[in-house]
Structure formats: C-alpha cells, structure tokens
Amino acid sequence: MDPEGLQLLLPPTTLAALANSWLQEDCPGLNFASLVTGSAPSQAVLWAKSPGVLAGRPFFDAIFTQLNCQVSWFLPEGSKLVPVVKVAEVKGPAHHLLLGERVALNTLARCSGIASAAATAVEVARSTGWTGHVAGTRKTTPGFRLVEKYGLQVGGAACHRYDLGGMVMVKDNHVVAAGSMERAVLKARQAAGFSLKVEVECSSLEEAFRAAEAGADLVMLDNFKPEELHPTAATLKARFPSVSVEASGGVTLDNLTQFCGTHIDVISLGMLTQAAPALDFSLKLFAEGDTPVPHARRF
C-alpha cells in the first residue's frame, strides 16, 4: 500500500486526543520557558540527520495543530531519508513551536525508526524469494501502540492483530486455564463466530496437529529453531493444507532469512517495535535568510 494513503487509517479525533495527551504529559502546568522565548511569529526547519524511512507525519501534524502551528512538508510519508535533508518547515508562535518540539520529535523519531526496521525486514525476507507476510507483534508501548503499528505499515510490514479484538489468539496460558488444547480452541471458535480468525500458539508438532484438528485457522510455531521449524511446518501443511503457519520467537534481522520457507506464511518479529533504534531529527528555529544545517551523525 502507498504510505501516503495510510494516513487515512488514522481517525482525526484519535490523532487530536493522542496529541493532546502527549502535550499534557510534557507540560501539565506552568511553562516557564515560554517567558524566555515570547510569542513572536517564528519558523523552524525539521532536519533528518540519520538514514531511514520517514514515518509519522500525521502525528507530527496533530501535535502542532493543537498548538496553532502550521507544518509544510517537503518529503512524502515513506520517503527514504539520506542525511542531512530538510524534511519540513513549521511556523507559529515561538513559545508554541518550542512547546511542541520535543513531543513531536520523539513521536516522529520513534515511528520512523520502526518503519525503517520494518522496511529492512521486508527487504531481507524478499531477498530470499519468500512471499509471505513480515509482521509485528502486540509487544508495543502502552499508550503508543497506534504510532508503532502505523510505523510498521509505513515500512511495509503487517501490523498483525491491532488489539485483543482483532483475532482470537490461544496461547499456552489460555490452554492451561481452559484445561486442554481442544477446549481452549472450541471456546475460541465460539467466541470468534464467523468474522474472526483463531490462532493457536504451539511448541511441538503434536500440539500443532491438535490445534489444527480442533479448528485453528492459524498455527503459530513458537520458538522453533529453523532446522526444526521447516520440517514441522511441512508435515503440518501436508495434513492440513488450509491452515496458515506463523513462525515467531527469536527472529531478528540477522537470522530472518533462516525462517523464510515455502510452508511459512507469516514471520513475526517483536524486535520491530521493541528494539528498533529511533531516527535522529532536529527542529531548528531560524531567522529570515539564515537556515542552519545541523551536522549529520557519523556512522
């Protein structure tokens, strides 16, 4: 999907509510620094100082919209950044620009970092000829999930289920609580109805067979070593060709290619949201006729 179109997924009311909550967190009371800057009309340039994928424009916009500032973008969402590059310009009262600066930079840097990691993962997987789905997980930051899931999609990865209502996933603890694999899947199928898929986490071929026989749509082969994963998936698919197989657990950018295979439909990586490094951006105020260029990071 075109990254530019992904912003249509984000409800304006949700964007405004998130932006307001982030600003409230950073400045719940008096902003003493505003007495230093004053409220004169000002402008600032957003610079990208590290390579990666630009993601998070809607959140950046929402933050400054709350502060009556205007953002003009020079690069579209999903652009590949080559530092140092001028990404956007923000205009508004000086004290409002600086009130939104850190919150907006944090959000953009984090979202872009996740998009960059996702794009790398997809590129690595595609280099093997594998055509399945690279996906994130539900291992996200509380209160920041929308940003992180959106970043995955800008980077070309699937966001997996957005929340508990997106799919019924039966994990080991659910099986223990239900009393058996079969009972857990039966209850999941009853809850899912016709509109939701049921996925079951399995740690052995025997569990995978039981899950598929009980009616699972997807079987997650969790924490399998690559040399065990592929024969297990092949055996499962031979018996249950309509069941999709997800590989998860221990997957990184370094070993991702080892998990790509004919019988694997989805590979999920928690590190895309848990370990992706943030990109480096800066927002610099400037006077008319004077646009400072920050130094790029050294790699």
From Swiss-Prot:
Entry-linked SUPFAM superfamilies: Nicotinate/Quinolinate PRTase C-terminal domain-like, Nicotinate/Quinolinate PRTase N-terminal domain-like
Single GO cellular component term: catalytic complex
Record-linked InterPro entries: Aldolase_TIM (IPR013785), NadC (IPR004393), NadC/ModD (IPR027277), Nicotinate_pribotase-like_C (IPR036068), Quinolinate_PRibosylTase_N_sf (IPR037128), Quinolinate_PRibosylTrfase_C (IPR002638), Quinolinate_PRibosylTrfase_N (IPR022412)
Enzyme Commission code: 2.4.2.19
Family: Belongs to the NadC/ModD family.
Keywords recorded for this protein, A-Z: Glycosyltransferase, Phosphoprotein, Pyridine nucleotide biosynthesis, Transferase
Region described as Important for hexamer formation: spans on this chain: 8-12
Entry protein name: Nicotinate-nucleotide pyrophosphorylase [carboxylating]
Quaternary structure (record): Hexamer formed by 3 homodimers.
Catalytic activity of the protein: nicotinate beta-D-ribonucleotide + CO2 + diphosphate = quinolinate + 5-phospho-alpha-D-ribose 1-diphosphate + 2 H(+)
GO molecular function per UniProt: identical protein binding; nicotinate-nucleotide diphosphorylase (carboxylating) activity
Pfam families: QRPTase_C, QRPTase_N
Positions contributing to quinolinate binding: 102, 138-139, 160-161, 171, 201, 222, 248-250, 270
First and last residue of the signal peptide: none
Gene name for this UniProt entry: Qprt
Biological role: Involved in the catabolism of quinolinic acid (QA).
CDD domains: QPRTase
Pathway field: Cofactor biosynthesis; NAD(+) biosynthesis; nicotinate D-ribonucleotide from quinolinate: step 1/1
Modified residue annotations for Phosphothreonine: 291
Superkingdom, taxonomy of origin: Eukaryota
One of the GO BP terms on file: 'de novo' NAD biosynthetic process from L-tryptophan
